[in-house]
Amino acid sequence: MFYKIAQKVMFQMDPERAHHLAIGSLKMTANSPLTCLYGQTITPAPVSVMGLTFPNPVGLAAGMDKDGESIDAFHAMGFGHVEVGTVTPRPQPGNDLPRLFRLKPAKGIINRMGFNNKGVDNLVKNLIAKKTDIMVGVNIGKNKDTPVEQGKDDYLICMDKVYLHAAYIAVNISSPNTPGLRSLQYGDLLDELLSAIKTKQLELAEKHKKYVPIALKIAPDLTIEEIENIAQALIKNKFDGAIATNTTLTRDGVSGLANANESGGLSGKPLTELSTKVIKQLAICLKGQIPIIGVGGINSAEDALAKFDAGATMVQIYSGFIYQGPKLIKEIVNAYRLK
């Protein structure tokens, strides 16, 4: 009930202003009696992924809490894990406003945020300050002004800084809102990046006597051949996981709607089928050697079950969470337990 009232108010506001208000409010109320307004108890449904055991298979996707400011509040809602970021080595403002648009009739969102964040050092402070033991993945990217050819250096800088504070690290090369970033998904650039990241991971594991898994987040706008090539690169470089998928540049299912022609990545219900299709193809290519975290257009328990059936071991929600609220977490976990 509280979420429905809050949503009604926030949906009257500019989307980005509403987002900042929500994150700020959650930050203020976390670890206080006010968590009763959105907290809930969820029966555990443990799942093992990438050598880690999560209390349930539903996580918060990257992009919601970029700077890790409200981790404890999301823990109170019952998420099995929270993925913070995308974070870059240096703070950056992101793209020009406006850059976030609701497509309410389609339960979709278009964003062209451009990795706006306060930088990796700020994120690390927030990770150290969190009071709960929730599993936190850290999604890392490159700064906009870093040439693509030198992009791997940004990923290595972020890895070095977050390594001790992350349950796992997600490598984001699939956002459509950083010029040239998606080119890292192909050919020699992909292999060079994955190889450098794997080498760094093993160095850090030896240095800190702690192995932190690494997952690659991919786009939905890929051909079968491109998915096959990514799968082969993941296996070759012994990556621990894949996250499928990011937002899409297609506009299927939203034509004619207000804001549908805005540039950026489309998420939410219009992405559901495309994301599931990519997960299914990726699962075929990976042959069970690397687990998949499924994300993209999960608006109901049924959508989540379709991701599991396609080959995902765990799921993440973002747009569906905005439209449905915390109850979606419980609905998915309950459906998973009965599966």
Swiss-Prot record:
An annotated GO BP: 'de novo' pyrimidine nucleobase biosynthetic process
Swiss-Prot/TrEMBL cofactor(s): FMN
Keywords assigned: Cell membrane, Flavoprotein, FMN, Membrane, Oxidoreductase, Pyrimidine biosynthesis
Catalytic residues (positions): 175
Keyword Oxidoreductase belongs to the record: yes
EC number: 1.3.5.2
Pathway: Pyrimidine metabolism; UMP biosynthesis via de novo pathway; orotate from (S)-dihydroorotate (quinone route): step 1/1
Gene Ontology molecular-function annotations: dihydroorotate dehydrogenase (quinone) activity
InterPro entries, sorted: Aldolase_TIM, DHO_dehydrogenase, Dihydroorotate_DH_1_2, Dihydroorotate_DH_2, Dihydroorotate_DH_cat, Dihydroorotate_DH_CS
Functional note: Catalyzes the conversion of dihydroorotate to orotate with quinone as electron acceptor.
Record's protein name: Dihydroorotate dehydrogenase (quinone)
